[in-house]
Regions:
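Short acidic/glycine-rich loops and adjacent helix/strand connectors
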Residues: 24-33, 97, 118-120, 138, ...
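Short beta-strand-loop/turn "lid" adjacent to the catalytic site in phosphate-handling enzymes
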Residues: 1-37, 41-54, 72
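Short, acidic Gly/Pro/Ser/Thr-rich loop/turn segments
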Residues: 6-8, 78-82, 138
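ATP-dependent carbohydrate kinase catalytic cores
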Residues: 35-64, 154-173
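Residues on a specific face of well-ordered alpha-helices
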Residues: 24, 28, 42, 79, ...
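A mobile "lid/hinge" subdomain adjacent to the ATP/sugar-phosphate binding pocket shared
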Residues: 121-173
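Glycine-rich phosphate-binding loop of actin/hexokinase-like ATP-binding domains
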Residues: 59-128
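Conserved active-site and cofactor/substrate-binding residues in soluble primary-metabolism enzymes
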Residues: 21, 109, 113, 131-134, ...
């Protein structure tokens, strides 16, 4: 069973949720055997079967080495990060992480300003403070402040819907 958060000794505290799940408790329901794994670890294991035309290159040549590492990144209620790597014998290993908790590192003056704005609200600004559902709202509000405009949007889904309906709107820009 794949769940959001780090698995420790067969137990997991779900990320962004008060729930705790354990293999032992699930086995009392008659589920045997039970193995809990991180949701992005599961996605890393599945990455090699994703059709090539469904993948996006984030740098380097479009046709990379088929034996190279595969990064899996994805926003949701948080920002998931994992990788599928191969050892020197060619054996695959899925490497889950809590990479969404890494600090946001601005790359230009606008991102510097976004960080400055978010630091007024948060002691520490991680990647998932920007890239996930709730993070989308943080980013939208920061960009509105930078642009000197008001935003009355309180729902990340509304930002997405507005951007899809009008790519030239502040939500889509």
């Amino acid at each position: 069973i794949a769940v959001a958060g780090p698995v420790t000794d067969g137990e997991i505290d779900l990320t962004n949720s008060p729930w705790r799940v354990s293999e032992a408790e699930l086995q009392t329901l008659g589920l045997k055997p039970v193995k809990l794994i991180n949701d992005f670890e599961a996605l890393a294991w599945g990455a090699p079967v994703v059709p090539r035309d469904e993948l996006a290159s984030l740098g380097g040549p479009e046709e990379g080495d088929p034996e190279s590492a595969i990064a899996v990144l994805g926003p949701g209620t948080g920002f998931g990060v994992s990788a599928l790597i191969r050892d020197f014998h060619g054996r695959e290993m899925a490497m889950p992480s809590e990479g969404g908790h890494a600090c946001f590192a601005p790359g230009d003056p606008v991102e510097d300003e976004i960080l400055r704005i978010l630091r007024r609200r948060y002691d520490r600004v991680s990647i998932e403070r920007l890239i996930c559902g709730p993070g989308l709202l943080n980013m939208h509000r920061a960009l509105a402040e930078i642009d000197g405009r008001e935003s009355h949007i309180d729902d990340p889904a509304e930002i997405t819907a507005t951007a899809l309906a009008d790519p030239n709107s502040p939500c889509g820009a």
